Amino acid sequence: MEFVAERAQPVGQTIQQQNVNTYGQGVLQPHHDLQQRQQQQQQRQHQQLLTSQLPQKSLVSKGKYTLHDFQIMRTLGTGSFGRVHLVRSVHNGRYYAIKVLKKQQVVKMKQVEHTNDERRMLKLVEHPFLIRMWGTFQDARNIFMVMDYIEGGELFSLLRKSQRFPNPVAKFYAAEVILALEYLHAHNIIYRDLKPENILLDRNGHIKITDFGFAKEVQTVTWTLCGTPDYIAPEVITTKPYNKSVDWWSLGVLIYEMLAGYTPFYDTTPMKTYEKILQGKVVYPPYFHPDVVDLLSKLITADLTRRIGNLQSGSRDIKAHPWFSEVVWERLLAKDIETPYEPPITSGIGDTSLFDQYPEEQLDYGIQGDDPYAEYFQDF
């Protein structure tokens, strides 16, 4: 669904400014230094105090809400169908993000199925690197999705500010994305819209994949043309039946973009981009490590019999690739790995400094009465 927060400019340090070009030897290995361990334990204790004010599964029950349960603080992003707001619960004081979609626009743009799929997918998933939805509700004009508020902003913003990431940094984010996609695919969910704009960073610098507007539960194959042009696999463009392998193509494009600062098939119009994708010619900058060139050549390939992730061993082939040889996957999943970048969150819980300011407008929320679109959104 083309509903993402506008591209914010991050405030404060970038990847280069934090000197994490040296974030290399053992970057994805667990920590061993005792003093560093003790410092991190103190930081974790402090973080536990902070996160006691954040949504926790054991403290906050998922369910049905109404607009009266929240105080709208400010707009975090705008899109074709509505807005994303930072809100605060009037019951527990915790902060959430509420995604609001205008029913009329969703129906007009023929996005009803995608919108219902998004609700269904978010209700199903629970993973450290995926956004969490707490509940939904609706009024006569809008539908509302209550989700975690992730303060660190978009990976897109950090990438544009940094221009491109050093090899180990791109590897870190790619590895967390792989674990998230692996989980989705194990539940027969294709994500179909992987891009930096849909990857948020939490306050510690770990990823959260958001915006499930194109996600779909698929047992075998599907045919729908959807996604963002630069990241779409060739089989989607040619309207051939496709499966989870399209996400691994997009992963390859994402890794390329993180390392180069631009996508491999970029052009001035979607049609020209599609032409380049179908031609399949990828030019690798000379500073790309040979291992990542080998990996990308096996991800960004139209030949599904060669695209790793789509072969008999599935995602294990990607995780076993030499480019990921340093990764301790179990530690990464447990978030027991140092992150290359911690967002400069200065105002504590509810900080919005990493999101752009938007003019606030009169909101038509909470209106009751006749609902001509009720039949389309019965599950909300």
UniProtKB/Swiss-Prot annotation:
UniProt-listed CDD domains: STKc_PKA_like
N-acetylmethionine, modified sites: M1
Domain AGC-kinase C-terminal, first and last residues per copy: 325-380
SUPFAM superfamilies: Protein kinase-like (PK-like)
Activity modulation notes: Activated by cAMP.
Family from the record: Belongs to the protein kinase superfamily. AGC Ser/Thr protein kinase family. cAMP subfamily.
PANTHER family, sorted: CAMP-DEPENDENT PROTEIN KINASE CATALYTIC SUBUNIT 1 (PTHR24353:SF153), CYCLIC NUCLEOTIDE-DEPENDENT PROTEIN KINASE (PTHR24353)
Protein's name in the database: cAMP-dependent protein kinase type 2
